[in-house]
């Protein structure tokens, strides 16, 4: 591609030229292969859950039952289908918009020359002909040609060519978009942008599917488990209805399909995407930009935070520690500060002079002193000297510098020894020292004023934040390239402990061979260390690997281009404020505010998100098992019937109210949270089983022919005998069972949100339910109650077979205490099972701290893990089977496409650019 405009290198393009070139070449980005909105909606209609709803609706209307067609059930199912499809669509779109908005906040920028002025510019606005400035850490934003004079660039092109060694590029040579500048500084002129660049052409050929996150795996397994459970249960129900009770095939088929529809997790995608999108926006308010939504769930389980020292735990600026000042003789500490500031530059000063002058606070304290001569620091003298006239008119010379230099100038042997001792003591702590001296006789003799030490001090909030993190079960480990002594001193000041491991020890702990796996002893040492000193980027990657090998979920912070591999390797990669483009690209979360406190806030937020997701999953499993289990036993034992439209109504109310859980008030956790499907299954099944027993036992109570006659409690006809139209269940029986079933299902939302008893609100359990949750639950419970009391039995939406009639207040007021008793019993089971798993988790966490093989896991703890592990294995096999079937055609299509376009060439000016695509690999 030839340039339409050749701009002068000292002026850059003008605004008019940029507009012309943007019209010609477009924006500098490779647009992802977006799915049209209509196809997204269509895909939702073709989703397996939607198809089940649609099939159930069609069967309800098409298959007559006792000569009647279930048009009411059909309409309700179609409405539920619309609700599921459109709520899911809008939730996904809102989540995508949230990520896009957050990504815009961290959009890559570049240094660009336009209209004769250098400034920051979004990378996507570059056009051919732009002049850009490149330095170490920058991701090259577009194909360019190096120009001007400066230090040659070392460029990492491994993402483009696979070559692991950096290459050197000089002015006049071409560089490619997507490569990373390792070192050097030069200007470049953009030659190709977007899809016209080398990288862009390759990306245009490839469609890389997004990686499936851990949360998606959990949700898939829950869906598969419930679907298999529903298929097995419904198959038996169908056999019982048609074989044992000799019901009409139409009735049996309609009933089974509606039950199946009520059991499958219809609202799961809506709830999960809403929870994550809400969480991402909450994180953005805390200056943490989420680039991968599933990272929110993974961050909740983070056990170790490997944090950079400089700029994250510390202020990244030298500071004078007033508590460490040694004042000599009759001089005070204030004298030491005053004389050190007199011999320092106040304007355009270096880091040391800035630390010294900042310690005094205000220049007014030296306003009365007149500097007649100032000798700046130089590598030979290693000191600064100021000739001064004091406010009283006396002549004074002050100096500050390397303590050994100042010590050699002193006449007093005791003062010289004090300097030597101070140097040795501070050096052992990794502190930089300065000596301060004065002369009253024009430099003939010098007397010691005192000694000061400088350090990069911890942030004011770092110590408390680290304590907070430790109280939350997150071990903060400092990672620094500074020397060992500095790391020890910083850890001591932060209250982190002093077990520091050096980077060279990390590399020495590798196994032999090509795998590069950490040694078991290294793994244990990394786990026990409080920090790491003398660390290079490759050490960070190995530290993360060692901690992960110990079974820890690791968060890693970084800011440099070479930190990208470690950020990618970590369970949660965190790019700190001021990070390079390469680090941001590899990170899951990007911080826009300095300090570790933002990370801790993000952990708190992520644990709240986990709580909401876990609550929903337990509730969804409990509700599905309760509904299926009740109908299984009620039909098997009592030939129980309920109008299908009532079952659809329960499902619709359930899906509508459960969405409110996305906004419910929850507490964070004092310890990392991990998915324990055995625990979740046990809690869900215990709640469901109590509900099943309660509802099944209620059937004979509302059937006088099976148990006893209802007393005449009101003017309504009593429930005495079953109907005589061949239906086994009367309308009032249906109403009372509907009230009991819907009541338990709705109340379980309140039950599952609290790991303790539902009424126990505390920081350790759960806060009071939010109005957003209480309002729909209360409304639906009230509506169910009024339907069970007042419904006119002559209104038969789906025909004569399906009976439903209000049973009156007296009967309803007897059912509600019954429901409440079983609900409380379920709560006790939930708490008891939770306490067992909490104890097991404590044992497993304690065993993590021991070297493998030293301690054995108790048998009962292993037994608790078996159901979940077995379910995971079965789900993995089923997922692999489905994935293989679904991707078979896609792989064939891609293979054919790559064979057709194995070599893509584009003539550009006088040369050729070749892109070789092999198999399915991305160049």
Please tell me what each predicted stretch does.
Residues 699, 703-874, 878-888:
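C-terminal transmembrane module of polytopic membrane proteins
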Residues 237, 270, 276-278, 348, ...:
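Membrane-embedded transport module
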Residues 1-118, 124-127, 132-140, 145-154, ...:
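Non-lumenal N-terminal regulatory segments of integral membrane proteins
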Residues 27-58, 118-119, 170, 174, ...:
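Soluble-to-membrane junctions at the N-terminal ends of transmembrane alpha-helices
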Residues 51, 55-76, 228-264, 277, ...:
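Helix-interface capping motifs at the ends of transmembrane segments in multi-pass membrane proteins
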Residues 75-107, 114, 210-307, 452, ...:
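Hydrophobic alpha-helical transmembrane segments
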């Amino acid at each position: 591609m030839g340039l339409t405009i050749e701009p002068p290198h000292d002026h850059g393009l003008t605004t008019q030229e940029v507009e012309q070139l943007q019209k010609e070449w477009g924006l500098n980005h490779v647009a992802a292969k977006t799915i049209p909105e209509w196809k997204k909606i269509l895909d939702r209609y073709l989703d397996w859950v939607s198809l089940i709803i649609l099939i159930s609706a069609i069967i309800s209307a098409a298959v007559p039952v006792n000569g009647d067609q279930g048009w009411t059930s059909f309409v309700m199912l179609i409405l539920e289908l619309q609700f599921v499809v459109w709520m899911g669509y809008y939730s996904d779109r809102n989540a995508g918009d949230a990520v896009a908005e957050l990504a815009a906040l961290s959009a890559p920028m570049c240094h660009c020359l336009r209209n004769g002025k250098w400034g920051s510019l979004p990378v996507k606005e570059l056009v051919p002909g732009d002049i850009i400035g490149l330095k170490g850490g920058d991701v090259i934003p577009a194909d360019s040609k190096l120009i001007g004079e400066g230090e040659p660039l070392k460029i990492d092109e491994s993402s483009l060519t696979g070559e692991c060694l950096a290459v050197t590029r000089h002015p006049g040579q071409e560089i490619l978009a997507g490569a990373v500048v390792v070192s050097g500084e030069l200007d470049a002129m953009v030659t190709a942008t977007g899809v016209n660049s080398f990288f862009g052409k390759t990306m245009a050929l490839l469609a890389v599917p997004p990686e499936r996150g851990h949360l998606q795996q959990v949700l898939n397994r829950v869906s598969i488990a419930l679907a298999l459970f529903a298929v097995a249960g419904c198959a038996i129900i169908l056999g019982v209805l048609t074989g044992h009770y000799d019901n009409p095939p139409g009735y049996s088929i309609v009933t089974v399909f509606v039950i199946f529809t009520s059991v499958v997790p219809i609202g799961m995608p809506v709830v999960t995407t809403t929870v994550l999108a809400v969480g991402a926006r909450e994180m953005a308010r805390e200056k943490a930009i989420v680039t991968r939504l599933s990272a929110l769930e993974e961050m909740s389980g983070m056990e170790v935070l490997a944090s950079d020292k400089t700029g994250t735990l510390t202020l990244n600026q030298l500071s004078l520690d007033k508590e460490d000042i040694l004042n000599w003789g009759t001089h005070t500490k204030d004298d030491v500060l005053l004389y050190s500031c007199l011999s320092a530059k106040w304007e355009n000063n270096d880091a040391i002079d800035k630390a010294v002058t900042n310690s005094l606070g205000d220049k007014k304290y030296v306003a009365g002193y007149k500097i007649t001569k100032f000798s700046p620091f130089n590598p030979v003298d290693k000191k600064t000297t100021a000739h001064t006239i004091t406010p009283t008119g006396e002549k004074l010379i002050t100096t500050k510098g390397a303590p050994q230099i100042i010590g050699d100038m002193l006449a007093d042997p005791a003062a010289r020894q004090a300097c030597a001792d101070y140097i040795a003591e501070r050096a052992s702590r990794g502190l930089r020292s300065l000596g301060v001296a004065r002369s009253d006789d024009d430099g003939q003799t010098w007397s010691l004023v005192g000694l000061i030490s400088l350090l990069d001090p911890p942030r004011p909030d770092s110590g408390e934040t680290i304590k907070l993190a430790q109280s939350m079960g997150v071990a903060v480990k400092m990672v620094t390239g500074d020397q060992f002594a500095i790391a020890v001193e910083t850890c001591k000041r932060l209250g982190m402990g002093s077990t520091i491991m050096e980077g060279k020890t990390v590399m020495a702990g590798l196994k032999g061979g090509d795998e590069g796996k950490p040694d078991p002893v290294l793994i244990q040492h990394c786990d026990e260390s409080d920090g790491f000193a003398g660390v290079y980027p490759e050490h960070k990657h190995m530290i993360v690997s060692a901690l992960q090998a110990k079974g820890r979920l690791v968060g890693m912070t970084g800011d440099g281009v070479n930190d990208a591999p470690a950020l990618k390797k970590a369970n949660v990669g965190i790019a700190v404020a001021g990070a390079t483009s390469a680090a941001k690209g590899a990170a899951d979360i990007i911080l826009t505010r300095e300090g570790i406190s933002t990370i801790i806030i993000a952990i708190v937020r992520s644990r709240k998100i986990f709580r909401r997701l876990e609550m929903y999953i337990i509730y969804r499993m409990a509700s599905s098992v309760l509904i299926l289990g009740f109908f299984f036993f009620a039909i098997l034992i009592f030939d129980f019937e309920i109008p299908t439209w009532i079952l659809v109504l329960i499902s619709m109310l359930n899906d509508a109210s459960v969405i409110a859980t996305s906004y419910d008030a929850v507490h964070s956790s004092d310890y990392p949270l991990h998915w324990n499907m055995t625990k979740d299954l046990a809690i869900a099944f215990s709640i469901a089983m109590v509900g099943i027993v309660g509802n099944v036992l209620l059937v004979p109570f509302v059937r006088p022919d099976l148990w006893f006659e209802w007393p005449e409690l009101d003017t309504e006809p009593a429930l005495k005998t079953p109907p005589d139209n061949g239906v086994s269940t009367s309308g009032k029986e249906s109403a009372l069972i509907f009230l009991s079933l819907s009541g338990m299902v709705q109340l379980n939302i309140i039950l599952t949100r609290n790991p303790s008893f539902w009424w126990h609100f505390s920081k350790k359990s759960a806060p009071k339910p939010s109005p957003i949750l209480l309002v729909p639950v209360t409304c639906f419970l009230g509506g169910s109650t009024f339907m069970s009391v007042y419904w006119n039995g002559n209104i038969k939406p789906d025909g004569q077979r399906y009976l439903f009639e209000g049973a009156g207040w007296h009967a309803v007021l007897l059912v509600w205490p019954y429901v409440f008793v079983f609900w409380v019993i379920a709560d006790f089971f939930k708490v008891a099972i939770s306490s067992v798993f909490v104890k097991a988790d404590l044992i497993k966490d304690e065993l993590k701290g021991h070297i493998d093989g030293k301690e054995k896991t108790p048998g009962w703890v292993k037994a608790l893990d078996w159901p979940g592990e077995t379910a995971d294995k079965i789900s993995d096999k089923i997922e692999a089977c489905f994935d293989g079937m679904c991707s078979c055609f896609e792989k064939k299509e891609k293979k054919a496409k790559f064979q057709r376009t194995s070599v893509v060439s584009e003539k550009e000016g006088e040369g050729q650019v070749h892109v070789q695509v092999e198999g399915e690999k991305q160049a």
